[in-house]
Regions:
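Short, flexible loop segments at boundaries between secondary-structure elements
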Residues: 135-149
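Short beta-strand immediately N-terminal to the catalytic nucleophile in serine-hydrolase-like folds
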Residues: 111
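Active-site alpha/beta core segments
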Residues: 1-107
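Histidine-anchored nucleotide/phosphate-binding helix
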Residues: 117-130
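Gly/Ser/Thr-rich loops at beta-strand to alpha-helix junctions
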Residues: 15-16, 114-118
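Short internal beta-strands
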Residues: 9-12, 132-139
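Short acidic-hydrophobic, aromatic-tinged amphipathic segments that line or gate anion-handling sites
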Residues: 162-171
Length: 172
């Protein structure tokens, strides 16, 4: 599918040790529980994609010949990072919108993990920033935490994000 795109941006979770989104950072808390942070409610995740570990590496079979940018997310220890456009505090921008606009890109296709978190936040932020947005459903995978997948699709649809399949790429 990557061959259908002239411009590809890859996001890479790049968490710090002891990241604020990790359940292990809060004694007595469990994975998928929540806690309050300065910017709102935070879902607590298992430790994952810690900088410099194999878990944080891009998969060796990922073939993206036209990838031009790898955008690392999660390196701010106190703020989670779901969206490729802004951190979970809704204040700290990643610079991706400017990067895309400078290149004249007006349409964004979103794939990856997890549909109901990073994909959804990225897609909705892209719409908010004026991009036409498609989520390629069969190129995503959800966590579906307590109905989060259905809620994410509903929110994305309400914001004008279009839901397609990889076979629809030629007609999008």
């Amino acid at each position: 599918m990557a061959g259908a795109f002239e411009n590809i941006v890859v996001t890479q979770d790049w968490q710090t040790q002891g990241h604020a989104s990790f359940a292990t950072s809060y004694p007595g808390k469990k994975v998928f529980e929540t806690t309050k942070l300065s910017y709102g409610t935070q879902v607590l995740w298992p430790d994952h994609c810690v900088q410099g570990t194999d878990d944080a590496s891009l998969h060796k079979d990922l073939k993206l010949p036209t990838a031009q940018l790898i955008l690392r997310k999660g390196y701010h220890k106190a703020v989670d990072s779901y969206s490729a456009f802004e951190e979970a505090d809704h204040k700290t921008l990643t610079g991706l919108a400017g990067y895309l606009k400078q290149r004249g890109i007006k349409t964004v296709f979103v794939t990856g993990l997890a549909t109901d978190f990073c994909v959804a936040w990225t897609a909705m932020d892209a719409r908010k920033l004026g991009f036409e947005v498609y989520v390629i459903e069969d190129a995503t995978r959800a966590i579906d935490l307590n109905g989060s997948l259905a809620a994410a699709w509903k929110q994305m649809s309400a914001k004008g994000v279009k839901r397609i399949q990889s076979g629809d790429i030629a007609s999008a």
